[in-house]
């Protein structure tokens, strides 16, 4: 095994396209990070194979903050940009999003997670820093919406490309098979705190790395991943 670096931070997104939740301890199951993308709002009647209501249609989605309640039976509550806190399955939240998006939507719960490709995503901090520098934009890892950011030893941007086809060990027990690069879209032009789209971000990714940034992976061995855990690359998957 060769050491790649360490986990810089771990995240999940309880509601697809809403704000991230930082994790000091990320439980990883065979389906991905537990409760990641567990809920999604769907555009009713959309013929698209990706019918989700996302920041592309409603940039303010990114400024809706989900959290788990402290009840005996925890549930997801969503704080809107106006400061209202609404249950994930409430008509009030659905109607709020419908008014903002100007289209009908419905809530889709999915305990396996609503993913576009694969359940686990990873990206190096070197790639994040390079994209920011090359595009002249603030360094904001969360615009890429990954589960794990890896602080790499060699600090080379796009180093994740070399992880494809290999198995990574994250911490003491978790093993993931890196299956493909992550093809990016206009979502990465949107900052997590709002503001105008920064198209230069996507331009750099398209020109330098075929519109790919970060990688997808499937879970081979479940366990727990924490910031600071070491990351190793094993033999080809």
Regions found by a protein language model. Give the residues of each.
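Metal-cofactor-dependent catalytic cores
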Residues: 1-237
């Amino acid at each position: 095994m060769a050491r790649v670096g360490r986990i810089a931070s771990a995240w999940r997104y309880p509601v697809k396209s809403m704000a991230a939740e930082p994790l000091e301890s990320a439980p990883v199951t065979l389906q991905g990070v537990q409760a990641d993308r567990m809920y999604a709002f769907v555009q009713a009647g959309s013929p698209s194979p990706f019918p989700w209501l996302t920041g592309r249609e409603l940039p303010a989605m990114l400024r809706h903050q989900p959290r788990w309640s402290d009840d005996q039976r925890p549930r997801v509550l969503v704080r809107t940009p106006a400061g209202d806190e609404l249950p994930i399955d409430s008509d009030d939240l659905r109607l709020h999003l419908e008014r903002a998006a100007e289209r009908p939507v419905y809530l889709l719960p999915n305990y396996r997670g609503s993913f576009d490709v694969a359940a686990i995503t990873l990206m190096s901090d070197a790639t994040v820093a390079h994209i920011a520098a090359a595009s002249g934009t603030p360094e904001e890892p969360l615009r890429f919406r990954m589960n794990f950011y890896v602080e790499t030893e060699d600090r080379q941007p796009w180093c994740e490309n070399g992880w494809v086809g290999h198995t990574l060990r994250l911490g003491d027990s978790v093993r993931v098979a890196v299956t493909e690069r992550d093809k990016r879209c206009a979502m990465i032009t949107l900052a997590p705190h709002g503001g105008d789209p920064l198209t230069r971000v996507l331009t750099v990714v398209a020109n330098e790395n075929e519109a790919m940034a970060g990688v997808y992976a499937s879970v081979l061995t479940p366990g727990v991943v924490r910031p600071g855990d070491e990351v190793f690359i094993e033999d080809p998957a």
